[in-house]
């Protein structure tokens, strides 16, 4: 059993971004709707834009990145398993990934 | 060639039948942001939840779970104390 302490520190930042995004999502979407609606007066739209920009920086979805759930590595992550290349290989050879087997022909 | 009025009528009727929003002149509204499915909960649960032995012992109020990392640390600490290289004692006021 492992704690989350084994992840890279940037994975913790990603975790923070995900939590903040989930927290502010409804507010963000509603203000986006107001801002992107050309039928509303311009003042109302600009005020909605200000409210979006006033959200915390880490609450934006562009800050979220899928990292390895084992090591926290940011590149070479398989989306289907959430693992980087090397942990994926280790688990695959240990027969721990369903549907994955070593190629042999 | 169908006239513009008939095409407009067809558009209105189609929106009514399929339950979509009627839109004239290809005007854009921000409706997609309101209709969009919320994905915060899914994104938040990307990393699997984990627990360590200290939290487990605190939760269960039990001491029977051995923490091998902690035991190793205590072993190393005793070894250093035996060599006279342990941590210095804190000053007494």
UniProtKB/Swiss-Prot annotation, chain A:
Q: Which SUPFAM superfamilies match?
A: Glucocorticoid receptor-like (DNA-binding domain)
Keyword annotations of the record: Mitochondrion, Ribonucleoprotein, Ribosomal protein
Highest taxon listed in the record's lineage: Eukaryota
Cited InterPro entries: Ribosomal_uS14 (IPR001209)
GO cellular component terms given for this protein = mitochondrial small ribosomal subunit; mitochondrion
Q: Which GO terms describe its biological process?
A: mitochondrial translation; translation
Q: Gene3D superfamilies of this UniProt entry?
A: 1.10.287.1480
- Which function does this protein serve? Component of the mitochondrial ribosome (mitoribosome), a dedicated translation machinery responsible for the synthesis of mitochondrial genome-encoded proteins, including at least some of the essential transmembrane subunits of the mitochondrial respiratory chain. The mitoribosomes are attached to the mitochondrial inner membrane and translation products are cotranslationally integrated into the membrane.
State the similarity comment.
Belongs to the universal ribosomal protein uS14 family.
Task: From the Swiss-Prot or TrEMBL record, give the protein name.
Answer: Small ribosomal subunit protein uS14m
Organism equals Schizosaccharomyces pombe (strain 972 / ATCC 24843)
Swiss-Prot record, chain B:
State the coiled-coil residue ranges.
none
- Which Gene Ontology BP annotations are present? mitochondrial translation
Query: Where in the cell does this protein reside?
Result: Mitochondrion
GO terms of molecular function: structural constituent of ribosome
List the GO cellular component terms. mitochondrial small ribosomal subunit; mitochondrion
Q: Which UniProt keywords apply?
A: Mitochondrion, Ribonucleoprotein, Ribosomal protein
Q: What is its main location?
A: mitochondrion
Give the domain of life.
Eukaryota
**Record-linked Pfam families:** MRP-S33
PANTHER family with a match to the protein in the record: MITOCHONDRIAL RIBOSOMAL PROTEIN S33 (PTHR13362), SMALL RIBOSOMAL SUBUNIT PROTEIN MS33 (PTHR13362:SF2)
Q: What function does this protein fulfil?
A: Component of the mitochondrial ribosome (mitoribosome), a dedicated translation machinery responsible for the synthesis of mitochondrial genome-encoded proteins, including at least some of the essential transmembrane subunits of the mitochondrial respiratory chain. The mitoribosomes are attached to the mitochondrial inner membrane and translation products are cotranslationally integrated into the membrane.
**Entry similarity comment:** Belongs to the mitochondrion-specific ribosomal protein mS33 family.
Q: Please give the subunit comment from the record.
A: Component of the mitochondrial small ribosomal subunit (mt-SSU). Mature yeast 74S mitochondrial ribosomes consist of a small (37S) and a large (54S) subunit. The 37S small subunit contains a 15S ribosomal RNA (15S mt-rRNA) and at least 32 different proteins. The 54S large subunit contains a 21S rRNA (21S mt-rRNA) and at least 45 different proteins.
What is this protein called in UniProt? Small ribosomal subunit protein mS33
What is the originating organism of this protein?
Schizosaccharomyces pombe (strain 972 / ATCC 24843)
The top of its lineage is: Eukaryota, Fungi, Dikarya, Ascomycota, Taphrinomycotina
């Amino acid at each position: 059993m492992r704690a989350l302490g084994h992840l890279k520190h940037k994975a913790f930042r990603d975790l923070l971004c995900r939590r903040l995004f989930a927290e502010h999502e409804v507010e963000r979407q509603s203000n986006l709707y107001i801002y992107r609606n050309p039928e509303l007066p311009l003042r109302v739209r600009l005020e909605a834009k200000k409210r979006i920009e006033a959200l915390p920086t880490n609450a934006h979805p562009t800050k979220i990145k899928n990292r390895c759930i084992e090591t926290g590595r940011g590149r070479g992550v398989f989306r289907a398993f959430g693992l980087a290349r090397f942990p994926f290989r280790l688990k695959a050879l240990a027969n721990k990934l369903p549907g994955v087997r070593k190629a042999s022909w | 060639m169908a006239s513009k009025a008939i095409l407009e009528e067809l558009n209105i009727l189609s929106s009514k039948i399929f339950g979509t929003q009627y839109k004239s002149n290809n005007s854009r509204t921000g409706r997609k942001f309101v209709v969009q499915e919320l994905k915060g909960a899914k994104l938040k649960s990307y990393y699997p939840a984990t627990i360590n032995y200290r939290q487990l012992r605190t939760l269960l109020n039990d001491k029977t779970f051995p923490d091998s990392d902690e035991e190793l640390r205590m072993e190393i600490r005793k070894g250093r104390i035996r060599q006279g290289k342990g941590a210095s004692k804190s000053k007494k006021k």
